[in-house]
């Protein structure tokens, strides 16, 4: 068995990635989220495949086909809710994974980090298009509002929006192409995941101390396979509790009303995992400015290696920057809350203040804190 594992051209790739991979001996549970994201991707592809067997991407039958899946298909309700809530679990793991990378300075592995940002954009695009497919009120109006943002692009904006819509409004052509892209993107994401892993295994994993761990490595299997398995059990337990007891708690009631272009919902808002970015978008009075700020709210992650001023890699031994980091986390929670609120006083001003704080903490306060800590520790 050992000979096959180490000599077979295909199996040895798996061996080097998941079995004999040298891993730091001190990585904590915060390093479990990579494998959990892999699990989420597998769950989404499998449940999505079975949903696609029964779904019809036509405006007249899309809503009915989702109802048919839930009512008439064997365990269709389970597959549908696992897919919908699996997306939420996916984003919870994504945010924690990115947060871990920010805390422990993993962004210094630039290729891995940049590939991660591309993956984040791809997953967000996939989730957005998936939300349109049930063709409920929030699906239709969410698609209309978000795609319409592209009209803010000077000169080509309007033409671009109509090209994406396949007409003069969100209609049959839009739904069909969104279904096509929603189906193909997870497979592209899978390919990008392998590139992400390829870059990671070039440098090796980071660890909580931020120090070089070459002198103290252990094999990935059995130590981290069993550790990952515990994470898998916790994730699946959480997902099944959500699916079986509270399947609609993260959804929007408006999406149980079929799409109607003549009736606008009182509050148009995306799924909860986009609310922080939506709040940043809404806090800018100018349309183009809002769109640019929205993109920058994610793209700013690519600047983190340039904004790193500390002589230490992670925040483990840096209390001032730690404080800044947790204020940033609180700020993101405030933005998520604001994104779900109506556009009126006092939510507008709170959203604007939280948006300014978000960029200020990342661009100004965290780099400053790093320099202050260097001086305190006399590391200059």
Swiss-Prot record:
InterPro entries: Cyt_b/b6_C, Cyt_b/b6_C_sf, Cyt_b/b6_N, Cytb/b6-like_sf, Cytochrome_b, Cytochrome_b_C_euk/bac, Cytochrome_b_N_euk/bac, Di-haem_cyt_TM
Subunit structure and binding partners: The cytochrome bc1 complex contains 11 subunits: 3 respiratory subunits (MT-CYB, CYC1 and UQCRFS1), 2 core proteins (UQCRC1 and UQCRC2) and 6 low-molecular weight proteins (UQCRH/QCR6, UQCRB/QCR7, UQCRQ/QCR8, UQCR10/QCR9, UQCR11/QCR10 and a cleavage product of UQCRFS1). This cytochrome bc1 complex then forms a dimer.
Main location class: mitochondrion
Organism: Clethrionomys rutilus
Entry cofactors: heme b
Compartment annotation: Mitochondrion inner membrane
Binding site for heme b b562: 83, 182
Cofactor binding annotation: Binds 2 heme b groups non-covalently.
Membrane topology, from the record: Multi-pass membrane protein
Stretches that traverse the bilayer: 33-53, 77-98, 113-133, 178-198, 226-246, 288-308, 320-340, 347-367
UniProt miscellaneous comment: Heme 1 (or BL or b562) is low-potential and absorbs at about 562 nm, and heme 2 (or BH or b566) is high-potential and absorbs at about 566 nm.
CDD domains the UniProt entry points to: cytochrome_b_C, Cytochrome_b_N
Binding site for heme b b566: 97, 196
A Gene Ontology biological process term: mitochondrial electron transport, ubiquinol to cytochrome c
Stated name of the protein: Cytochrome b
């Amino acid at each position: 068995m050992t000979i096959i594992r180490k000599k077979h051209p295909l199996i040895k790739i798996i061996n080097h990635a998941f079995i004999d991979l040298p891993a730091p001996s001190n990585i904590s549970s915060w390093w479990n989220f990579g494998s959990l994201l892999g699990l989420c991707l597998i769950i989404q592809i499998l449940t999505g495949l079975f949903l696609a067997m029964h779904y019809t991407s036509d405006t007249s039958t899309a809503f009915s086909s989702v109802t048919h899946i839930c009512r008439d298909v064997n365990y269709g309700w389970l597959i549908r809710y696992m897919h919908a809530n699996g997306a939420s679990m996916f984003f919870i793991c994504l945010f924690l994974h990115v947060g871990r990378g920010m805390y422990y300075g993993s962004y210094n592995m630039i290729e891995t980090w940049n590939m991660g940002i591309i993956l984040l954009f791809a997953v967000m695009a996939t989730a957005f298009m998936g939300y349109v497919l049930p063709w409920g009120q929030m699906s239709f109006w969410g698609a209309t509002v978000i795609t319409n943002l592209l009209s803010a692009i000077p000169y080509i904006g309007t033409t671009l929006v109509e090209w994406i819509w396949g007409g003069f409004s969100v209609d049959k052509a839009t739904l069909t192409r969104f279904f096509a892209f929603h189906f193909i993107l997870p497979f592209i994401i899978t390919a990008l995941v392998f590139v992400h892993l390829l870059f990671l295994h070039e440098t090796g994993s980071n660890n909580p101390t931020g120090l070089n761990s070459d002198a103290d490595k252990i094999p990935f299997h059995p130590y981290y396979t069993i550790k990952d398995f515990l994470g898998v059990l916790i994730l699946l337990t959480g997902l099944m509790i959500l699916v079986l007891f509270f399947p609609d708690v993260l959804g929007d009631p408006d999406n149980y009303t079929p799409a109607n272009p003549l009736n606008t919902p009182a509050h148009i808002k995306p799924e909860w995992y986009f609310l922080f970015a939506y709040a940043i978008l809404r806090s800018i009075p100018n349309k183009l400015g809002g769109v640019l700020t929205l993109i920058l709210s994610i793209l700013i992650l690519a600047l983190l290696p340039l904004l790193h001023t500390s002589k230490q890699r992670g925040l483990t031994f840096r209390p001032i920057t730690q404080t800044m980091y947790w204020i940033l986390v609180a700020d993101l929670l405030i933005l998520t809350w604001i994104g779900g609120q109506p556009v009126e006083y006092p939510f507008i001003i709170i959203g604007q203040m939280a948006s300014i704080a978000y960029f200020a903490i990342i661009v100004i306060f965290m780099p400053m804190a790093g320099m202050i800590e260097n001086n305190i520790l006399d590391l200059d």
